[in-house]
Each structure stands twice: as structure tokens, then as C-alpha cells.
């Protein structure tokens, strides 16, 4: 299997409380993989913004981080997607505020639109830190899609590179497949059987993907969700 190669890593940057932490995480990731880092800011360029970005990037200049700051105005989703194509980004990092119901946040945010439409790998960063904190857990979407095998493989290769403790593959099931009106014991049993069959089907599909990944990358880290 070929080693994962992120020649260019992009990150969408906004002036949120996590800006410095997001930049630091992206810079460390770029250095780890020997990648160029592209900061994508949706908005007009200004001297103040540029100085802020340069200030946060300055600790990594001595480590020979190659980077570029890109300013573009427009719709956030359109700007980020077009910028990843223009700059030939292999991995896009998006800072996401963690909420109690992360799934609800993910499904209702622009992050979903970007992850569905992006032509590159996407990493949602929910616990950024200014100082390095070892990554312990990666969650990857295992939905049925032509790109899923590549996505899951990349997640395990990255996890191996970062030394994570656990990689969770989350399976998505269409609600229409499990839509059964439960109004008596018979319909309840039917609903339970359908859900169990779907669970077994999805687990078998994901395990088939995992069987193609080197065992030393998946050993003691796999969790299906």
C-alpha cells in the first residue's frame, strides 16, 4: 500500500477564539507530513489580519514550514471549495466548535456541505490546542460511498502516523431503511429484525474495507459505531 501523501494542507481560518489553536494544529500537522500549508480566509485582505496570521505562524518559521495565506471574499462554502481546487489541496482542515450534540452540529452546519462536495480529504478539528496535545481518537465517516474505502484507509494511515489510541468508523444508515411504524409486538419485532440486519450488513461492508488495510495500522484501534 502506498503511503498517504498530503503535499498541500489547507485550513479555513476565521477570527474566532480558536484561531491561534487552529493554526498551530494545522502547522504541526503540515510539518508532520512534510506538507505546504495554505491558510484560506473568507474575506478581504487587510494589514491587521495579515499581521495576526504572521504572528501565529512565526513559531513555525524556524522549523521551515512552507505556507501561504489566501484571502477571498464570497460565500464561505464556495470560496473554500474553489480554493482547495485552485491550490491543489490534498487535505482540508476545518475548525468546528464542539457542542453537546456533535452529530446535530455536523449535520446542520456548512461543514457538511464542504465534506460532501470537497474533492480532497477533510478533517474536522473539534479540540484544537495551542500547545501540542497527542491525538488519541479519530472518527471517520464510513457511509456507503465510492470514496469511503480511500477515506477510511487515509484515516487509519494518519492515525498510525500520529500514534492514536482509537479510530472509530461511524456507519450512516438511511432512516427510510429502518422506518417501521411500531404499534404492537409484531411490528416491534419486525423493526428490531430490520435494524439488526442493517447493522450486520454495514459491519460486514466496513470490515471488508478494513481487511485491505495493513494489520499493524488497525490493530487495537478499530471501533465500529
Residue ranges, per PLM feature:
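Small/aliphatic-rich secondary-structure junction motif
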Residues: 1-55, 59, 63, 136-192, ...
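Structural motif
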Residues: 49-51, 77-82
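Well-ordered, non-membrane alpha-helical segments in soluble/globular domains
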Residues: 53, 199-206
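Rossmann-fold cofactor-recognition segment
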Residues: 66-69
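Charged docking surfaces used in two-component/phosphorelay signaling
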Residues: 71-79, 222-225
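Gly/Ser-rich helix-loop-strand patches that form or flank binding pockets
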Residues: 81-131
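A short acidic, glycine-rich active-site loop
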Residues: 189-201
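A short, acidic, amphipathic alpha-helical segment used as a generic capping/interface helix at domain edges
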Residues: 205-210, 225
Amino acid at each position: 500500500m502506498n503511503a498517504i501523501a498530503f503535499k498541500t494542507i489547507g485550513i479555513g481560518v476565521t477570527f474566532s477564539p480558536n484561531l491561534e489553536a487552529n493554526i498551530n494544529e494545522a502547522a504541526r500537522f503540515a510539518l508532520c507530513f512534510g506538507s505546504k500549508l495554505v491558510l484560506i480566509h473568507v474575506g478581504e485582505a487587510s494589514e491587521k489580519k495579515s499581521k495576526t496570521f504572521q504572528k501565529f505562524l512565526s513559531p513555525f518559521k524556524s522549523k521551515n514550514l512552507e505556507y501561504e495565506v489566501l484571502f477571498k471574499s464570497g460565500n464561505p462554502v464556495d470560496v473554500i471549495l474553489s480554493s482547495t481546487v485552485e491550490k491543489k489541496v490534498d487535505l482540508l482542515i476545518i475548525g468546528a466548535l464542539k457542542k453537546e450534540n456533535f452529530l446535530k452540529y455536523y449535520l446542520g452546519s456548512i461543514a457538511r456541505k464542504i465534506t460532501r462536495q470537497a474533492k480532497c480529504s477533510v478533517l474536522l478539528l473539534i479540540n484544537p490546542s495551542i500547545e501540542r496535545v497527542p491525538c488519541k481518537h479519530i472518527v471517520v465517516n464510513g457511509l456507503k460511498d465510492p470514496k469511503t474505502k480511500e477515506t477510511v484507509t487515509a484515516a487509519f494511515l494518519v492515525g498510525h502516523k500520529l500514534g492514536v489510541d482509537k479510530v472509530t468508523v461511524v456507519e450512516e444508515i438511511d432512516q427510510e431503511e429502518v422506518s417501521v411504524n411500531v404499534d404492537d409486538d409484531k411490528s416491534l419485532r419486525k423493526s428490531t429484525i430490520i435494524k439488526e440486519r442493517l447493522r450486520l450488513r454495514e459491519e460486514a461492508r466496513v470490515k471488508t474495507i478494513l481487511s485491505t488495510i495493513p494489520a499493524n495500522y488497525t490493530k487495537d484501534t478499530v471501533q465500529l459505531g
